[in-house]
Structures are given as C-alpha cells and as structure tokens.
C-alpha cells in the first residue's frame, strides 16, 4: 500500500481510546483522505476528550459508540485495531484485513529503527536513548508504547535519522516482518496473563522484535536469553548483558562490575547507580552509546543527571519530612519488589501502598520484601485478595482501604519523619481508575493536598 492509496480505502478504527493513540491514528488517516468509521465500546461521554480533538474532521468521520456493528467490519477495506484487542476477537474475524497503528506506520516508514521491549524498564530506557542520540542525530524521534504514536510525527521524518520505538508484547504481536537495526529486550517477567493463555505465547510475541531482523544486533539479558529466547533464530548478532558478573562468557556480553562496564573482557567505561530499578536501563543505554560511537563523556553526564520519568519511581514531594514516591507503572509484583529494594536503606522505613486489579499473576515474590516494609497499606481490588493471602501466611499486619484517598491519608498519618510512602500497586488499575497513568495522577493530587 502506498500513501496515495489511503484516500481510496474505507478504514475502520476499532478503539479510539483516551491515551492519544487512536486520535493520532485517525488524524493520520484523515489527513491522507481516508473514508473513516470510528467504533468504540465506550460512550460518547467517556470519549469526549478524544472526540473533541477530532472536531476539525467531523464531516469526514462516522462514529459508532457504545457498541460495534458487524456490518462496519464486513464493509471496511482495513480495520485498524487497538493493540489490546485480542486477535481472536469475533469482530476481527469478519475483517478483510487487520492492522494496528504500528503495523500501518511500518508500511510507510523508511527511517532506521531502534526497538525496545521487555516487561519493565522500557520507558526509562527509551527516554535515556533519546537523550543520548539527539546530540548526534538532532532529528531522532521517540514513539510507541511510551504514549506517542509514530503516526503523529510521520510527516516530520527524514528517512535517515534513527527512530526509537518502545513496543509492548501486544504491539509486537501483529508485526510479521519487523526489521529494526537494533533491538533490545530489557527483561522478562510474568505479565498480562489475563490476556495470554500461557507464558510461552507471551515470549513468542516478545521474540517478534528480533526474529525477522536481517542485520544489526539484538541485546538480551543473559538469564532471559538462555531461559526463553535462545530457541528463536535471527540473522541479527546476539549480544547479552548482565547487571552483575555474567553467568556465561561463551557469547558476546556486556556487564557491570563494581561500577565498571565491560564488553567481554574489555573495560569500556564506568558509572555508578545506587537504585536497582535504574541499573539495567542505564547499563544498556551506556552500551548502546558505545556501540553507536556516541561520546561516552556525554553519555555519562546523561546518566548522572537522569532523575527518572513520570510514574516510574517518581519522587513527588516532601511533606513534613515524609517522602512520597509515585510508582504507578509498577503493575506486576516483581516490579514493586525492585522498587522497594531500590529505595530501602538502613536509615529509612517504607510504607507501601499496593493493590488493584488482578492480571492472573503470582504474588509470592512479595516474600522477598516483607521485612523491608514497615506498613502494608492495601487498596481494595481483585489482586488485593492474593496479596492478603501472602501477608497472612507470614503473619504480617495489613490495612485495607476502599479508596486511594483513604490509603494516602493513612500512610501519611502513620509515617514518621524520614519515612517513605511508596505507591507501587503491583496490579492493574481498571476497577477504580481509567488506567495506571490516571491512577498516578490522582495519587500526586492527593499528596499535594497534604501540604
């Protein structure tokens, strides 16, 4: 399909949503003359912000909201689905052709792609890579799962500067011929088991970041590679990494040892990172800078000055000498465990706010941090029942609240000067919030109200 062919086709956007991806997709199609129908199970009132942002195209759009119409799926030349819609959806079975915003973008894109996936750490890593590359490549772009559809800046691409894409397993699922110049898998934990029938299917989708790569390198954590990805073939050169001394030196590998970074046996630089949760993204970013011949002194300054990104172990405020951290993006237990370990020192106590919607995950890893948490403050939800079971097995006291407001107020009430209140839910957000970002914003507003 060529760009000039869009105007001759009937498109159906399945899932306008509230996070901007559906709007960017719709704008791209409308700008290129598509005949467009937008359908979403949410109501017009729920989608008001997204609909308002498309008002200048009102005469070109037909909306079907609060339901789906089978005839729309039968008539459309191309259905562009939200990545979270499962491929076996009954409506998609009626479609002649199904794409996503990412797969559609890749049809037209000519820029070289650096692709990043992984269960956790993706957004932190792509943010670091973007900062590292923009000095050498002023027209570098960043998009994907970080909240910016690459279709939103398609017309600004020059065909040669690097494009950094953060990709979730759902986004990778539909990509059959994806061929980046450099691909990265930060880590793999159990996640989205409410979406996948088994963990192997999750791994298969993650592997699509590199299986069709024809050149360049793929960077994978050594333990994850040997456990999950060594069975997949690719023409890309595999380079492993380890945040500690490597478990195997038979393949090319970079790793950190007491702040020094080695590639195989060669020292390539050094940096220090005290927070466990930032160690892997910073280590990978440092090596990518080395691999792409980016000034390592420049890279060192970026790593030194990097304070994280919103919603990922984000320092919010100091209130009466109590520190508040927003870690709403921790939607699995392993991520919350890392966050607690990152903040815990001998001089502070952590009051942990946790709980939410279950994703069919195992919370037994919480046993690793039971003795690191001063108070367990739980928000009601389907996942919270599982957390309670883990705590009760260890005879740990906990407090359950019906609202985030109640949890925040109680955490502040019991905190002593020097304590940390960490909001790291280890769960999805859908029972009480629109999404995890809405949840994080509400947490920050509540903290602001404390003083």
From Swiss-Prot:
GO terms for molecular function: ATP binding; UDP-N-acetylmuramoylalanine-D-glutamate ligase activity. ATP binds at residues 118-124. Its EC number is 6.3.2.9. It comes from the Bacteria. It is found in: Cytoplasm. The keyword Cell division applies. GO terms for biological process: cell division; cell wall organization; peptidoglycan biosynthetic process; regulation of cell shape. Keywords: ATP-binding, Cell cycle, Cell division, Cell shape, Cell wall biogenesis/degradation, Cytoplasm, Ligase, Nucleotide-binding, Peptidoglycan synthesis. HAMAP family: MurD (MF_00639). This is UDP-N-acetylmuramoylalanine--D-glutamate ligase. It comes from Borreliella afzelii (strain PKo).
């Amino acid at each position: 399909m060529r760009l000039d062919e869009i105007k001759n086709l009937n498109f159906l956007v399945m899932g306008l949503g509230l996070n901007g991806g559906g709007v960017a997709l719709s704008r791209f199609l409308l700008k290129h003359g598509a005949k467009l129908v937008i359908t979403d199970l949410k109501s017009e009132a729920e989608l008001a912000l997204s609909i308002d942002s498309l008002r200048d195209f009102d005469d070109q759009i037909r909306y079907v909201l609060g339901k789906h119409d089978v005839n729309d799926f039968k008539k459309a030349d191309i259905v562009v689905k939200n990545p979270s819609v499962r491929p076996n959806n009954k409506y998609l079975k009626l479609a002649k052709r199904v794409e996503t915003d990412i797969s559609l973008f890749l049809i037209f894109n000519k820029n070289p792609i650096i692709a990043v996936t992984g269960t956790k750490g993706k957004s932190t890593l792509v943010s670091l890579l973007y900062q590292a590359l923009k000095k050498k490549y002023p027209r570098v772009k960043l998009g994907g799962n970080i909240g910016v559809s690459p279709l939103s800046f398609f017309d600004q691409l020059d065909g040669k500067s690097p494009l950094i894409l953060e990709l979730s397993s759902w986004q990778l699922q539909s990509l059959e011929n994806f061929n980046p110049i450099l691909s990265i898998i930060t880590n793999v934990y159990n996640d989205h088991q409410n979406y996948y029938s088994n963990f192997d299917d999750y791994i298969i989708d993650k592997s699509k970041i590199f299986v069709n790569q024809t050149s360049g390198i793929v960077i994978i954590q050594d333990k994850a590679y040997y456990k999950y990805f060594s069975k997949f073939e690719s023409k890309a050169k595999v380079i492993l990494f380890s945040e500690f001394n490597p478990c195997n030196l038979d393949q090319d590998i970079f790793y950190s040892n007491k702040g020094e970074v080695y590639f195989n046996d060669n020292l390539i630089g050094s940096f220090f990172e005290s927070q466990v949760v930032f160690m892997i993204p910073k280590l990978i970013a440092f090596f990518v800078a080395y691999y792409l011949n980016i000034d390592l002194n420049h890279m060192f300054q970026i790593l030194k000055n990097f304070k994280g990104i919103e919603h990922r172990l984000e320092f919010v405020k100091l209130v009466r000498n109590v520190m508040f951290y927003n870690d709403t993006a921790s939607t699995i237990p392993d991520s919350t465990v890392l966050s607690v370990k990152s903040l815990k020192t001998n001089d502070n106590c952590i009051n942990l706010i946790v709980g939410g919607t279950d994703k069919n995950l195992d919370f037994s890893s919480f046993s690793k941090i039971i003795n690191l948490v001063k108070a367990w403050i739980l928000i009601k939800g389907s996942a919270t029942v599982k957390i309670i079971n883990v705590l009760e097995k260890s005879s740990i006291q906990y407090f359950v609240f019906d609202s985030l407001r109640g949890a925040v107020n109680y955490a502040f009430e019991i905190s002593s000067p020097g304590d940390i209140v960490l909001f790291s839910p280890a769960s999805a957000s859908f029972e009480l919030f629109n999404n995890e970002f809405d949840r994080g914003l509400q947490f920050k507003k509540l903290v602001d109200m404390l003083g």
